[in-house]
Regions:
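Short catalytic/ligand-binding loop motif for oxyanion handling, primarily in non-cytosolic enzymes
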Residues: 21-25, 46-50, 87-90, 111-116, ...
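PAPS-dependent sulfotransferase catalytic core
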Residues: 1-74, 134
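Hydrophobic/aromatic beta-strand patches that form the interior of the parallel beta-sheet core
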Residues: 11, 38, 102-105, 183-185
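Glycine-rich phosphate-binding loop used to anchor ATP phosphates in small-molecule kinases
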Residues: 70-92
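Conserved phosphate-donor/acceptor-positioning beta-strand/loop module used by diverse small-molecule
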Residues: 97-119
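PAPS-dependent sulfotransferases, especially Golgi type II membrane carbohydrate sulfotransferases
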Residues: 1-9, 174-176, 203-271
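PAPS/PAP-binding and catalytic site of the sulfotransferase fold
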Residues: 20-34, 98, 182-210
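PAPS-dependent sulfotransferase catalytic domain
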Residues: 67-68, 124-199, 254, 260
Length: 271
């Protein structure tokens, strides 16, 4: 038993943050509906908000973190982490564990993703009154030179500089994710298809975990029910685009490259 390969019981689900998006939150809760699954929700992204161990953008060594999950989750048939890491950070996992540790990257329509990215920051990232460390970090890494020709802003104009930075993520950070050898899955497809959800689970767990119809009924009943602390929101790409002001339209056209737009179009998104 000492030689048993525990690595293949671990998996990663990546994204460029989930920012309080209900459907992104729904996915790990859905996975955890099976008692043989143990799934973290952005664990290593949230820790720096509360513990002075590292900066918000830093993460533990991912190979060591994989072994840690394998150790503490031995009582589960499968265990994984959602959203602590980005797809472009998984190369060490691929080299160390190969196909034993499986991984998928979850993408979202850019307009909707951007809405939650900005909202998360304008609402102080779920921190209490007076707790500004996370948003202070966000401000400290804004690349102001990139936005000098756009609508001006101050530190207090979080809705402006967060919008610009979110566009930079769409054009740069997410494009790095697309270059990594990983399955990219649209979140919209998972929430609209039980088959695609179960296919993803089968892939991640090497066919070790499945869900009964009653479990799936419960899982999909949560899609439009806010979790603790959430607001009831229904955000559509069309609604978002129509709500933009001129400065937002200008910023989108100047910051998001055509190459980036084409990549999202390739995955079935419309602008």
């Amino acid at each position: 038993m000492d030689n048993y390969n525990h690595d293949s019981h671990i998996f990663y689900i990546t994204a460029q943050g989930y920012a309080g998006d209900h459907w992104y939150s729904w996915l790990p809760k859905a996975l955890n509906a099976n008692p043989e699954m143990f799934v973290y929700l952005a664990n290593e992204g949230s820790r720096p908000k509360y513990f002075a161990e590292r900066t918000r953008s830093e993460r533990p060594d991912i190979v060591s973190f994989t072994k840690f999950i394998s150790d503490v989750c031995r009582t589960y048939m499968a265990a994984g982490d959602c959203y602590s890491y980005r797809a472009n950070q998984l190369e060490p996992v691929a080299k160390e564990f190969g196909d034993n540790v499986r991984k998928v990257n979850i993408i979202r329509h850019p307009y909707v993703w951007l809405y939650f990215y900005v909202r998360w920051r304008t609402s102080n990232m779920r921190m209490g009154t007076g707790e500004t460390k996370p948003i202070e970090h966000e401000w400290s890494i804004v690349e102001h030179e990139l936005y000098k020709d756009l609508k001006p802003y101050t530190k207090e104009d979080v809705h402006i500089w967060a919008f610009y930075r979110g566009l930079t993520f769409l054009s740069n950070h997410m494009m790095r994710d697309f270059k990594f050898d990983i399955k990219h899955i649209r979140l919209e497809d998972i929430v609209s298809s039980r088959d695609k959800f179960t296919q993803m689970v089968s892939y991640l767990t090497h066919d070790r975990v499945g869900y009964t119809n009653s479990q799936l009924d419960e899982i999909y009943s949560w899609l439009y029910k806010p979790f603790r602390g959430e607001d009831k929101l229904y955000i559509t790409p069309k609604g978002q685009r129509e709500s933009w002001e001129d400065w937002q339209i200008e910023a989108f056209e100047k910051i998001v490259s055509q190459e980036s737009k084409n990549k999202f179009i390739e995955y079935g998104y419309e602008f």
